[in-house]
């Protein structure tokens, strides 16, 4: 399982540990990923995704999973999130 947020595409970054003597050693910065069940209002069920805490706050800020998926570009979303996005769009078009 890769360490990438399924909603924002946020992944690992590479940088340096810098000691007091200014010695630099390579290190990775991993995103804070959580397995979360987000409720879709349009589908009426929960969707389990692996989301960064930043992504979780962004979803809540926009007003829920459905709004987030419809406003986000497809390139940023994982295949699982794209599948949910298509289901939500189909459900909203039928309503």
Swiss-Prot record:
- Keyword field contains Ribosomal protein: yes
This protein is called: Large ribosomal subunit protein bL28
Q: Could you list this entry's UniProt keywords, alphabetically sorted.
A: Ribonucleoprotein, Ribosomal protein
Molecular function per GO = structural constituent of ribosome
Q: Which domain of life is it from?
A: Bacteria
The record's family statement is: Belongs to the bacterial ribosomal protein bL28 family.
SUPFAM superfamilies linked? L28p-like
Q: Which organism is it from?
A: Zymomonas mobilis subsp. mobilis (strain ATCC 31821 / ZM4 / CP4)
> Single GO cellular component annotation?
cytosolic large ribosomal subunit
Q: Could you give a single Gene Ontology term from the biological process aspect? A: translation
Matching entries from NCBIfam families are given as: L28 (TIGR00009)
InterPro entries in UniProt: Ribosomal_bL28, Ribosomal_bL28/bL31-like_sf, Ribosomal_bL28_bact-type, Ribosomal_bL28_sf
Q: Which HAMAP family match?
A: Ribosomal_bL28
Is Membrane tagged as a keyword?
Answer: no
